[in-house]
Amino acid sequence: MGIVVFGAVFVDIKGFPDDIYIPDGRNVGHVEYIHGGVSRNVVEDIANIELRPTFVSIVDDSALGQDVVRKLNNHKVNTDYVLTIPGGMGTWLAVFDHSGNLAGSISQRPNLMPILDLLEEKGDEIFANADSVIVEVDMDRDIIKKVVALSKKHNKKLFGVVSNMSIAVERRDFLQNFDCFICNQLEAGMFFMEDYADRTPEELCEILAKRVTLGKIPAMIVTMGDHGAVYADLTGDKGICPPQKVRVKD
């Protein structure tokens, strides 16, 4: 079954102005509808490097939901555990300014609790065949508890990613059960209630090493955009991964 990824599917609705963006005025531009969601993006990226992952999620019972599943299947993602339920997908509405920077956004989260029912019914089947597991840590608490329990039962590595850090900070107690937690520089600042915006990779690496020790978090990776990423774990291992050239799409 390969890597199993748990999380929400979002539809990203993005607005781009044709001219200078006026926050309190009308702006002419264009709107794009994009399949999104952190876990959906992650599972597609994993599939793109030929690792044949499995996705556990929910989509709407609509043409758009069918299109999400069709695209994932085209990328060789196993969607056998993607449920089809009315209102199953979330929505992210975002407006960008004339420089391409995010000017504002609103997120509507889906109801993911049907995944808990799926885990009660087929959890052992899913985890027994998994190589490792990735889950959005800001999913419903009961779902995270079940994922953690099944990971321990079947001795599977558990990795956490984040969609909404405001919710994820309430899951601190769970992170000690994860093999690794991955977030970006801004999210790390929110998580540890500090400002890391101007920190260099060298500085953040040292800070992260201290923070994972104090928080008893087994390991963390913090991405830093064009500065690469830093990592640290409870064994004292830490370091910096330099950036690689990529084509930025979004």
Task: Give the location of each predicted region.
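Conserved beta-alpha-beta core of the PfkB/ribokinase-like small-molecule kinase fold
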Residues: 132-206, 227-229
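Glycine-rich phosphate/adenosyl-contacting loop at the front of the ribokinase-like
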Residues: 1-58, 63-70, 74, 92, ...
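Conserved phosphate-binding/catalytic loop of the ribokinase/pfkB sugar-kinase fold
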Residues: 84, 94-132, 137
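Short beta-strand scaffold segments in enzyme catalytic cores
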Residues: 91-95, 104, 228-232
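Structural alpha-helical scaffold elements that stabilize or flank donor/cofactor-binding regions
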Residues: 125-126, 173-174, 213
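A glycine-rich helix N-cap at a beta->alpha junction
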Residues: 71-86
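Conserved phosphate-binding/catalytic region of the ribokinase-like
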Residues: 3-4, 27, 199-250
